[in-house]
Amino acid sequence: MRAQVRGGWWSLILAMVLANAPPAVDTASAHAALPVEPQVVRLATGGVGGTYRPIGNLIAQALSSHDASSCATAPDCPAGGVLVVSQTSNGSVANVEAMERGLVELALTQSNIADWAFRGTGRSQGRPPATSLRAIATLYQESLHLVTRADSGIRSVPDLRDRRVSLDEPGSGTLGDVRELLSAFGLSERDLKPEFVKPDLARARMREGKLDAFFIVAGAPMSVLQSAARSDAVTLVSIDGPAVDSLLARLPFYSRTVIPDGTYPGVPDTPTIAVGAQLLVRADLNDDLVYRLTRALWSDNTRAILDKGHAKGSQIRREHALDGISIPLHPGAERFYREQGMIR
């Protein structure tokens, strides 16, 4: 009897609780109402004063906004879409190392740095090949800038002997390029008074009379140099001649270019060398995701963001996407280019 009474009371209490409970919610509806976090993809860019950082910020913005708006209709889209987050870095070499360590999924890097790292050759000689690297696209050409004060007396690369020169930071692609250039001219770091700082700090040191020149590889125009040319007496040094001929014959991923008159206020046409800037991705990133990122990269939405966001953005064109790529394409990117008839 006691058991029956206890059971009766519990039944009564349960009935009262249910009577006062809020209406039942369909489980599927409840899950649908909850916000779904986007998949985060990290993009390594560059340092302050260069081109990688602003271009990387624009690409991250474009891929994220495009994916968020189109994800609902894509059957292979992860719930919540994709958020591409740009991160500053020391440059190409550091970006490749970050990809190898799994710290980022996407990275901007110079084509020669990508090639050397993937094969374990050149400046990556003696290191294990970076087999996790895959390519999405070549974006634009980067020019080697040799910047000096107009009154420095530096008119050519050999004039750098015994001068105070910044070669950019360790981890940058610029440092490797400058070492190759100096070697072509019969010089090395020991022949200079080298420093290793980014262009914004190099410019400040040059204004203070503590530095004679600095190198930077970046897409022209660079905002830090536009500002310097307007307010400081700076100029660019031509990089040309037989030494450059031998450099290009030995390392064909370099090419000749000219930084046009007017790119920087008061600076005339300046011959120099260039290398491709590429967007890389880890090999283990999902094929469908990389396909959608590649498709978004060449969308009208991204086109508008790049054209408005940076002077170099207008030079990022789909017809040049495969120029100079010497490491394997990611299967997701390859699928997109095959659909476009760019690969057979």
Language-model regions, residue ranges each:
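Bilobed "Venus flytrap"/periplasmic-binding protein-like clamshell domains
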Residues: 40-72, 141-208, 303, 323, ...
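An extracytoplasmic/periplasmic, membrane-proximal ligand-sensing/linker region
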Residues: 197, 201, 218-236, 252-253, ...
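Immediate post-signal peptide segment of exported/extracytoplasmic ligand-binding proteins
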Residues: 27-43, 77, 154-164, 331, ...
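Pocket-lining segment of extracytoplasmic ligand-binding domains
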Residues: 111-113, 121-122, 152, 188-280, ...
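A structural signal for short loop-to-beta-strand junctions that line the ligand-binding cleft
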Residues: 126-139, 262-271
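Bacterial N-terminal signal peptides
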Residues: 10-23
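Short beta-strand-to-loop elements that line the ligand-binding cleft
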Residues: 70-77, 82-90, 189-199, 216
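Bacterial N-terminal signal peptides that target proteins for export
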Residues: 1-12
